[in-house]
Amino acid sequence: MMKIKRFVYSLPEEEFYELVYSQNLSVEVLERKEIEVIFASYKEIEGLTPEKVEEVKEDWENWKEKFKPIEVEDFVIIPSWKKPVIVKPGLAFGTGLHPTTQLCIKALKKYLKEGMTVLDVGTGSGILAIVSALLGAKRVVGIDIDEKAVNECRENAELNKVKVECFRAEPKDVNESFDLVVANLEIHIFERVLKDILPKFKKIGIFSGLYKEKDLKRFEELLGGLKVKEVFEKENWYAVVVEKG
């Protein structure tokens, strides 16, 4: 635990948003009145006199959790420790909103180690490939059978200033193996291509797109004895982590 100072301010709503936008501030909104916003900052804001200064004891991680992205008009103000992924809206190849995408990101955050090589099967808009690169993967390859998806993957990788090799291909066309493979597909697709995906990873496989326990059970049958390391669940969707060795 650590002691930190919290500066509490009050401003008319319009001035509050102008301040937050112009100075790129991370603040905690404490209360909204009719035309006034009462907010706190964990550092003193130049040019403003705080209504009060509090000394609080708080865990650093919990303190950081209080700072959330703030939307102001067409802008999103993001705390420096967050990793934004910029996505150009496309033709339903993935926006990050679906539970399966979120489960894959959660698994990547836990199991992807810096310096790993990664293959993203069914890359779509490239979100999982981009996240892998941002997490420190040494090399990231994204494949998809749809040329439009491949183009979106390339565009989004450029927007995020990360290197992702995007190709139109099926798993059987890949002639190398990777430390980690991530595949967010559907059970009927896994029934057809999982046999081609499994040889492509050396250490960790992350698989999602599985709905309810019937899909989960069927997927485990397709693994052919490989060890399930962990299962993630959200809103009846599952992601499975498979480990080799």
From Swiss-Prot:
Keywords: Cytoplasm, Methyltransferase, S-adenosyl-L-methionine, Transferase. Its EC number is 2.1.1.-. Transmembrane segments: none annotated. GO terms for cellular component: cytoplasm. GO terms for biological process: methylation. S-adenosyl-L-methionine binds at T101, G122, D144, N184. The keyword Methyltransferase applies. Disulfide bonds: none annotated. It is an enzyme of class 2 (transferase). It catalyses: L-lysyl-[protein] + 3 S-adenosyl-L-methionine = N(6),N(6),N(6)-trimethyl-L-lysyl-[protein] + 3 S-adenosyl-L-homocysteine + 3 H(+). It is found in: Cytoplasm. InterPro entries: Ribosomal_L11_MeTrfase_PrmA, Ribosomal_PrmA_MeTrfase, SAM-dependent_MTases_sf. It holds the Pfam family PrmA. One of its GO terms (molecular function) is protein-lysine N-methyltransferase activity. Belongs to the methyltransferase superfamily. PrmA family. PANTHER family: ELECTRON TRANSFER FLAVOPROTEIN BETA SUBUNIT LYSINE METHYLTRANSFERASE (PTHR43648:SF1). Methylates ribosomal protein L11. This is Ribosomal protein L11 methyltransferase.
